[in-house]
Amino acid sequence: MVAAPAQPGSGGLSLCLASVGVVKALSVVAFKLVWTHSIEKTEWQEDWRITPGGLELMQARVKGFGAGMEPAPDARLVDGWFQWQPKRAAMPEVVLANSGAAGEWRLCSDGHCETLSGIFGHPIGINVTTMRACDP
């Protein structure tokens, strides 16, 4: 598991993931979301923080560019990755779709990554997963 299950009454916020009628709460305050673009086969990474206002995107990185993967105009090239800090408000929820064409979303925390199917304990296939900040 990418993080320990959230403990009710432990205070603070957790990351809640919902897919196919199952909800998982993870005790993390920040995480990295990683996926491979279905057409370009290029890796994309995003660093997220859980806040009382929702999920806040702190930094995005893409290894290259192509169809629908253009780095932001203020991106810098660092060690082969285009990196930038998106300027957007925290979001109450983030919906992750999966075409099934390029592998799964991976969630990373404390140097360990796991697929969403691994976190849920069963294949999620092309089903949508919703992420949101939640109280454990």
Q: What residue ranges belong to the model's regions?
A:
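N-terminal secretory signal peptides
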Residues: G9-G66, P71
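Residue-level marker of positions within ordered structural domains that often coincide
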Residues: M1, G53, A133
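Mature, soluble, non-transmembrane domains
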Residues: E70-P136
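Boundary at the C-terminal end of the N-terminal hydrophobic targeting segment
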Residues: A3-P8
